[in-house]
Amino acid sequence: MTGNAVRLHRVLRAPPERVYRAFVSADALAKWIPPNGFTATIHHMEPKVGGTFKMSFTNFTTQQSHSFGGEYLELIPNELLRYTDKFDDPNLPGVIQVTVSLKAVSCGTELSIVQEGIPDVIPVEMCYLGWQESLVLLAKLVEPEIQQ
């Protein structure tokens, strides 16, 4: 895959099953995926190989939204997700590919994310910053051990 890319790596204090579920549950995804200052609406989500999803991020200040969707290319429960993203806005052309790898480690899950094919009009550092913010929210969702 060509184009701009970001690579992220984290260790989360949660088992791979919980981290994987945060990527394939619409309610969970809406809670953690939008970066700071945005809300997310999951319009549909069919987490299976060949399945599709559609979501929108809305800027809380301006109320402007941008929508995107994609297709699930590969899913290995608790280990791997590979999917595409394509913006509805014609000014954001191309297809982005995202690979999420999960590995059980002694203290939880090692998470690696590669996002490739980012459109040239989107600064890569802004993508990276957005992912960093989202991953903080992901940790806040999956790390607590709440019994009940």
Q: What are these model-predicted stretches?
A:
Residues 1-39:
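Hydrophobic ligand-binding cavity/cleft-lining segments
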Residues 2-4, 47, 62-66, 90-94:
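A generic structural micro-feature
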Residues 3-9, 16, 40, 52, ...:
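Intrinsic-disorder/low-complexity, polar/charged segments enriched in Ser/Thr/Lys/Arg/Asp/Glu/Gln
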Residues 13, 75-77, 105-107:
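Structural motif
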Residues 19, 29, 53, 72, ...:
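Hydrophobic pocket/interface hotspot
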Residues 41-84:
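Glycine-rich portal/gate segments that line the openings of hydrophobic small-molecule binding cavities
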Residues 82-132:
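Beta-strand/loop substructures that line and gate deep hydrophobic ligand-binding cavities in soluble
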Residues 141-148:
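Short, highly charged C-terminal tails/helix-capping segments
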